[in-house]
């Protein structure tokens, strides 16, 4: 899961990847601890009978690739077996999408991961919405979402966490069908 370390970043949109890991790990009796050789917090869980490793890089977002590469090298995990969970400006809050491969789409964390791993890894994209102007993106991702947007983001994460055992047991297609069939969430009337 991608995010920025430290309490000052914990509630920001850019930490949606960390939010996912923070929901997934305890649900499967897992916890993360600092692992200096991976430059992050890591832990092992068992999901659908498979042992999986979770990682939250403790470098800033745009330097996450080294942590993930170190982790994969040590565990001998090929890129195509890696899932990177990250915030996605191009999806509205309340939407999560799974895909394999592709470019960075302007996401600096993904750019760094791609520079260390190539493009073949899987991505779970958690929609955070777009501020409307490219000039506002940096401040937007580093701010806490509105209460409505946070609820929608967390609902998308909840659905992805609930469907994750299906990904492990049955493959990506079924999880993709469930996530991608969900219509965009509607904002509550103000």
Question: Model-flagged regions — what are they?
Answer:
Residues 97-103, 141-145:
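Short glycine-enriched, charge-decorated loop/helix-capping segments at active-site entrances
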Residues 1-101, 111-124, 131-136, 151-158, ...:
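Nucleotide and nucleotide-moiety/phosphate-recognizing core
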């Amino acid at each position: 899961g991608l995010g920025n370390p430290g309490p000052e970043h914990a509630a920001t949109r850019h930490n949606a990847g960390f939010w996912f890991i923070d929901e997934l790990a305890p649900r499967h009796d897992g916890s993360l601890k600092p692992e200096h050789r991976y430059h992050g917090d890591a832990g092992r869980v068992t999901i659908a009978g498979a042992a999986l490793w979770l990682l939250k890089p403790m470098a800033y977002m745009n330097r996450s690739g080294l942590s993930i590469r170190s982790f994969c090298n040590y565990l001998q995990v090929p890129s195509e077996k890696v899932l990177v969970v990250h915030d996605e400006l191009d999806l509205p809050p309340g939407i999560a999408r799974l895909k394999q491969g592709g470019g960075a789409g302007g996401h600096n964390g993904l750019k760094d991961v791609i520079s260390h791993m190539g493009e073949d890894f899987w991505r779970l994209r958690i929609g955070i919405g777009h501020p409307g102007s490219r000039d506002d993106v940096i401040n937007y991702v580093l701010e806490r979402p509105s209460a409505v947007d946070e609820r929608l983001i967390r609902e998308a994460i909840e659905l992805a966490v609930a469907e994750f055992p299906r990904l492990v047991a049955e493959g990506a297609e079924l999880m993709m069908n469930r996530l991608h069939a969900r219509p965009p969430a509607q904002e509550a009337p103000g």
